[in-house]
């Protein structure tokens, strides 16, 4: 079952790619429901789907609505796994959803603070020292982007935009905090994702998955 934010290109893109990949692997989408960003009452949607048979809810969107949807679903007795994307990665998901509701919840992300890779451990420690809080995936991506550009400048044949662009496109096996990445012919990053599992709203498990 997919419940998506119909006002978000991000959510619609995740939903379409999930549906394509899931059905190609033999899965069945039993239904699709929609809301728009800013909605706060999801009881009508959840009451409508409560009696349906489904193994999981795929919930592409951001934590603002996801936290409320998961909380309302659990209150209605819907205990099936909830799956999402990197839009779940915020401490406010716990504030909105509540610890009791945020079990059997999994989301794909760019990195996990549970990763014991020395690069990740150092990044988290340095970030905490400077800013007094734990970084999320968007902080890690920002850091990696800066390092990625610096690396490309160092490899470029000249210090001009065209040369740097070429160097960026030629990136192979760049060691980033969010994982080793290469750039494909369409300028997309090829890298592993991390699947994170929550226990009482806190990251409890993480597993890297490569294509």
Predicted regions mapped to residue ranges:
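Extracellular/periplasmic periplasmic-binding protein-like sensory domains
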Residues: 70-143, 197-205, 209-210
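An alpha-beta-alpha
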Residues: 1-33, 56, 149
């Amino acid at each position: 079952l997919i419940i998506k934010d119909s006002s978000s290109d991000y959510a619609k893109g995740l939903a379409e790619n999930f549906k394509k990949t899931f059905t190609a692997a033999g899965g069945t989408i039993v239904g699709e429901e929609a809301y728009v960003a800013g909605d706060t009452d999801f009881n009508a949607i959840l009451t409508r789907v409560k009696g349906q048979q489904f193994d999981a809810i795929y919930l592409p969107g951001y934590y603002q609505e996801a936290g409320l949807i998961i909380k309302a679903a659990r209150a209605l007795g819907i205990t099936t796994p909830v799956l999402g994307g990197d839009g779940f990665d915020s401490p406010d998901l716990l504030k909105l959803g509540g610890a009791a509701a945020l079990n059997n919840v999994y989301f794909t992300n760019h990195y996990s603070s549970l990763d014991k890779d020395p690069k990740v451990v150092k990044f988290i420690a340095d970030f905490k020292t400077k800013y007094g809080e734990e970084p999320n995936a968007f902080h890690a991506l920002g850091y990696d982007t800066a390092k990625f550009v610096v690396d490309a400048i160092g490899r470029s044949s000249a210090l001009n935009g065209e040369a740097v662009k070429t160097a960026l496109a030629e990136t192979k096996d760049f060691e980033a905090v969010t994982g080793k990445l290469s750039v494909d012919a369409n300028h997309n990053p090829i890298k592993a994702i991390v699947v994170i599992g929550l226990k009482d709203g806190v990251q409890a498990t993480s597993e890297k998955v490569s294509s």
